[in-house]
Structures are given as structure tokens and as C-alpha cells.
From Swiss-Prot:
Annotated organism of origin: Thiobacillus denitrificans (strain ATCC 25259 / T1)
The keyword Zinc appears for this protein: no
Functional pathway: Metabolic intermediate biosynthesis; chorismate biosynthesis; chorismate from D-erythrose 4-phosphate and phosphoenolpyruvate: step 6/7
Name of a matching Pfam family: EPSP_synthase
EC number from the UniProt entry: 2.5.1.19
Official protein name in the record: 3-phosphoshikimate 1-carboxyvinyltransferase
One GO cellular component, as annotated: cytoplasm
UniProt cross-references to HAMAP family, sorted A to Z: EPSP_synth
Amino acid sequence: MEFLDLPGRSRASGTVRLPGSKSISNRVLLLAALAEGVTDVYDVLDSDDTRYMLAALQALGVGVEDRGDNHWRVTGVAGAFPARQAELFLGNAGTAFRPLTAVLALSGGDYVLDGVARMHERPIGDLVDALRQLGGRIDYRGTLGFPPLHVHPPQAGADVAHIRGNVSSQFLTGLLMALPLRRLRTRVEVVGELISKPYIEITLAMLRRFGVEVARDGWQAFSVAADACYRSPREIYVEGDASSASYFLAAGAIGGGPVRVEGVGRDSVQGDVGFADALAAMGARIAMGPNWIEACAPAQGRLKAIDLDCNAIPDAAMTLAVAALFADGTTTLRNIASWRVKETDRIAAMATELRKVGATVEEGDDFLRVTPPETLRAGAVIDTYDDHRMAMCLSLVSLGGVAVRINDPGCVAKTFPGYFNAFAEIAR
């Protein structure tokens, strides 16, 4: 297995230009494909997950042209994919798999969607059930409720669908993106609490950019009009990735700073910019502009522990678990059940790896409680579980002045291929 040895460091400062947001990149690429007209998409994230989406769109007959420098020109199909049959391999890209499942289920072709072994363990039954209510015809090719899937042309369905909100916000995102293809007024009602609401806000904002306004009743019901259709905005710029910003902001809070990230800020549509507020609650000094955020360590003393509901920042909250190693007291992260159905079971994985460096960790179904050791244990070998965020989060341990080995560092290619180079630039 490949590994990367990170030397112990104690300072962090500098400026990082963030890569494009994964969540926004894949939404925009799919919407541009469905729209009427040509869309120039700038600052697209170059990563495994976006490559899977681009390859899928090409297989479906969409014109996608690489114009260089993360600029893609997408020629929209105005709702109907030219390829009526295709087999799509989508790796472990939930931001591609879930929306494409919904769109293809309502678009009138015969398609197979598959992914890596971990994707076969990530639930999709709630989305499939909702699509079936709308007339979708979807078969499981393996375990009931999980990929791979075989999608057939839809039949007539209801004008209301119900979907559970507490498993993955990507299910609702996929449904909302697919609804304009029906050309019927359709209402989606959320059963129970909707998790990760900021990701739905991203979806609604992107649909609006492509000409579709979703009417909503709080967070419990969403409606799309019969005449809704996607129209190209001609050009669109992708924000920097706010989840990726969390590692560098935490580095500034741990290693003195200032560390500035460029590409997200006060004007961001991404909920993970709320990570900066969590760091501030821990005592970090935070400054923010429209398109940048800067973090420094507390003026005096160490960070302090927090007890936080992380529903709104599920991905960035992972970084808080590692920041807790550098805080006085016991940090509790709550409402993180969605971690268990991500690229790996992130609650179990994080608990295991934090214990390797000496932390006392308690894990529950939907919480993680971290008490730092008096001294971090040097020489830990960190396993990453083919999970990009595990690798990036746990690199921060090295800012405690201890060397760490990161196994399979290449897994960061899922969202941030240049992460370790960027980290080396700011770690002193």
C-alpha cells in the first residue's frame, strides 16, 4: 500500500486557493446537460467524482468539451438524452449516482448504474421508493435497497411523492433535479426531519440559476410547476469547495495562522462555511470577506471544547473531530448519523484513528465524543478507508508536532488531488 509520511509541524500560515466545489460542480454539469442551450462552466473541480459525472454525460450522448483550465462547455439536450441505452460506472460518487438515478428514472430510457464495492453498501432504497411513486421502473441487480440498479422507461405515476429526510439529502436533491422532466406539477413531501438542509439550499440555488423555481413549504414539502424547464444561463462559475476549506481553516486555528482560503466566503451558497463559526466557538479568531475566510489561533491559550449539533455541516464536522485533539476539554459532535452511510462508516473510522494518537473517544449511533490526550502519540499509522475526507482531516494531527503516516494518500483524488501539496505549503 502506498503511504505518505508527514513530519511533525507546529505552525501553519499562508494562503490557499480552493479547488471548485464538488457538490456544485456535479449539480451544474448535470443541469447544464438537461438544459436547453450551451453552458460554459468555469472552475469545475477536477477530481474522480466529477470525471465520473462527465464520463456518464458523454455516454448519454451529451456534448461536453474540455476547454482547458477547468472550463467545460456543455451542450444541453433540453431534457431528453440522445442515448436511450447505457451502462454507467460511477465509482463511489454519490453526487453523481443519486441525481443520475433520479433523472434517468424519469427520462424514458433503459440504463444500468453501477459503482465500486462501497457504493453497493450505500443505501438508495428511499430514493428508489420515491421514484416508483412517480412512475419510475427500477430494479435492484444485487441487494434490495442498494446499487447496482437497472432503470427502465417510466410509466404513469402519482403527482405526489414521499421521501424520508433523515438518511441522505442527496435523495431529495436527485428528486428535485429530475422533476422538471415530468412536465407535470409534482410535489415532494419529506417524512421526518430533513438532514443537511444547506445542501438542499445549494440544489435550490442551482435550479434557480437554470430557470426552475421550486416552491417550498418550510423544509417539509417542495413543488415544481408543470411548465418548469431548464434553460442555460450561458455561463456559470463554480465556487471553491467549502468542505475542503475546513482543513486549512483548522490548520490556522491549530497552528497559529493566519491561514486564508480563497474561493468561499460570506457570499457562499454552501452550508459548510458554517465551519468557521464552529471554529470561532472553539476560540479561534476568524475573519471573513465576500470570497475569503481567514483563521488564526486564539489570542491566548488553546482552543476550547464545544458541544455542537452538526446537522448543517456534516462533511466539515469531521474536521472538528480532529481539531478536538487540540482543545481543552471534551468535544461532542451530535446529529451525525449520516456519517455512517458516507464513503465509509465515518463515525467508526474516526473513532478508531483518533484512538491511535491517544484520544479517548466515545461513539454512538449519531454522535462522537472526543477527549484529547495530554500528549499526542507520535508515529501513528493512519488508515484512510478509501475516504478522501479521512485522509485530509487526519493530516492535521501532524500540526501537534508529531510525525504521522497516512496510508493510501491517493484517495484524496476523489475531491482534492492536490491536497497534500497545498497542505505542505502552509505547514511549517
